[in-house]
Amino acid sequence: MAPGTLDDNSADGSEATWSEASARFIAHLRHERGLSAETVRAYAGDLDQFREHMNATAGTADPRLSQVDADAIRGYLAALHKTRKKTSRARKLSTLRSFYHFLNDRELVRENPAALVAYPKLGTKIPSFLGVDDVFHLLDSLNAGAARAGASWRRCRNWALFECMYSTGVRVSELAGMDESDVDFHEGMVRVLGKGSKERIVPVGGKALDAVKLYLRVLDSQFPEARRMGSALFRNARGRRLTTRSVHRLLRMELRRCGLWQHLSPHGLRHTFATHLLNSGADLRAIQEMLGHSNLSTTQRYTHVHVDQLMKVYDAAHPRSRRDRSGK
C-alpha cells in the first residue's frame, strides 16, 4: 500500500486522516457510483470545507477521523448559520452522513457522528417544478451512470424511467403501468392508459427512446428471466412491475445522488414537462391533450410561466401585438 492511502484491512481506520479517507470516498463516488464530475466536485468541496473548519477551530490541519465527533459537526453547521441557507447546510450535513456511511460499510469507523446531528428544518414549501438546467443536470447524471462500463440494469432503468417521465409528462401511475408493447420505437409514440381507462397517444423524445432501448438490452443481458414475469416496462429487483411508491423513492434518491436537494415528486416532473413546453411557445390545448386533462383549467394550474415569457410568446404570435414594450 502506498504511503498516505487508506486500506480496508487497517487495524483502526479511525486513525486515518481526513484527507486520506476523503480521497478514498471521492474515488468511490467517481469510479464505483459513476457520479458526474460536477457532483463529485461538490462532495469534495464539502469535505474540504469541513477540514478547513477543523483547522480554524481546533488547530488541526488534517484531523484524524477519531478527532471528529457530533459536537464538532454541530459547531461546523453553527458556523455556517450566518452565511449559508438552510438548504445549503442540509446538503453539507448530508455529504458528511454519506461519507461516514461509506466508512461504516467498510468497517473503517465504528460510528457515524453525522447521523447524530439533526438536519436544519427546511419548512414545508415544496417546489413544484425544476428549471431546464436542473432537469438536464439530473438526466445527464443518470445518462452518465447508465453509460458507464458494467452499469447495472437498474441504473439503466432509472435513466429510462425519468427520461420517459420528463419526455411525455405522464402521471406516475401511468408510467408504472406501461408495458413494453406500449412503446412504438418506429413512430416515436407511447400508448398511455389514463384516468377512467381513457387511452391516449403521446409523443416521446429520442433521448427517452435511446434510454429505453439501452435499459431493455442490459435487462435482457443481466436479468433474462425478467421477461417471464409479466409485460411491465419498468421492473423492480424481482423483475415485477415497479410501484408508484418505488418511483417516488427512486426520484428522491437520484436527485440527491446528483446534488439536487429540491423536494420534488414525480408529479413535479409532470408540472416541469408542461411548464417547459409552454415556456417554449407550445399551444396550451396540445399540452392538455398530452397530459390527458379533461379541462383546460386543470392544465393551466400545471404551468408556471413568467409574465415576461408570456409577453414574448404573445409578441411573437399575435399579429396585432405591440412589438415595442419600452413605452415609446
Swiss-Prot record:
MF-aspect GO terms: DNA binding; tyrosine-based site-specific recombinase activity
Family annotation (PANTHER family): PHAGE INTEGRASE-RELATED (PTHR30349), TYROSINE RECOMBINASE XERC (PTHR30349:SF77)
Core-binding (CB) domain mapped to chain residues: 16-104
GO cellular component: cytoplasm
Originating gene: xerC
Protein name as catalogued: Tyrosine recombinase XerC
Family: Belongs to the 'phage' integrase family. XerC subfamily.
Organism of derivation: Syntrophobacter fumaroxidans (strain DSM 10017 / MPOB)
Cystine crosslinks: none
